[in-house]
UniProtKB/Swiss-Prot annotation:
Transmembrane segments: none
One annotated GO biological process: positive regulation of cytosolic calcium ion concentration
The protein's role, per its UniProt record: May play a role in carrying and orienting carbohydrate, as well as having a more specific role.
UniProt xrefs under Pfam families: CD52 (PF15116)
Source organism: Homo sapiens
Stretches of the chain forming a coiled coil according to its record: none
Lipidation feature positions (GPI-anchor amidated serine): S36
Membrane topology recorded in Swiss-Prot or TrEMBL: Lipid-anchor; GPI-anchor
Propiece residues: 37-61
Domain of life, source organism: Eukaryota
Protein name, UniProt field: CAMPATH-1 antigen
Length: 61
């Protein structure tokens, strides 16, 4: 049961990251001041860090 929950959590986090990157990539409008690419990268890195921390908490608990 613990492995099933771990697998479900991992898959849901991967789907969440894919949705987040898809939504941030679709904001291509004709604005004069667009956010830099590093802001999107930092958001992805933060999500990856949170997902990694949660996975390790479940794995080592």
């Amino acid at each position: 049961m613990k492995r099933f929950l771990f697998l479900l959590l991992t898959i849901s986090l991967l789907v969440m990251v894919q949705i987040q990157t898809g939504l941030s990539g679709q904001n291509d409008t004709s604005q004069t001041s667009s956010p830099s690419a590093s802001s999107n990268i930092s958001g992805g890195i933060f999500l990856f860090f949170v997902a990694n921390a949660i996975i390790h908490l479940f794995c080592f608990s």
